[in-house]
Amino acid sequence: MPKAILLFTVCIHHFIGCDLERIYRELEEQFPEITFLRCYMDPIMQKHGPTPDQKLRKAMYESLDSEPDKMDTKQISILGSDFALDQSSDLKELLPKAGYTVRELQSCRTWEEYKELGNAGTFLCCYPSGKYGIELLAKRLDRTFLYLPLSFDYEEIKKEEEILWNTLKPEDNQ
């Protein structure tokens, strides 16, 4: 059995009046060992609010949780992007030097590694479409959230690094 299923409903389910909450409830009762992630493909119903891409990224992290005693203030989960940051990126080089463990969804090979993302003391997002979902995740788990969009402008990079270090307050500020 899979550990999780991303279940996509589409606009036709809304048009015909499906009771989606009942469907999810019954699936969860029949298969308690599986996490059913609620994903939507409803661009026709999209009038305002988050885009379908933002909703998908939010759904991908809704099963992350953490017990308060498992929160690791020295772990940073970088989430929300389609691709892992390059090993030579400033964040991937500087954070470990300051004593932080950096985790990303793209490096998770097991469900357990995925769930470990939720133990981070800080959730960092660099990708605009991921901001909505990661910000809600940080709020739900009462964690620090940082949005530091990727930039090629040196002044912007310097400003974002200042925000990063002022938020984290490491002992040995890089």
Describe the predicted segments one by one.
Residues 1-174:
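An N-terminal assembly and electron-transfer interface module characteristic of large anaerobic redox
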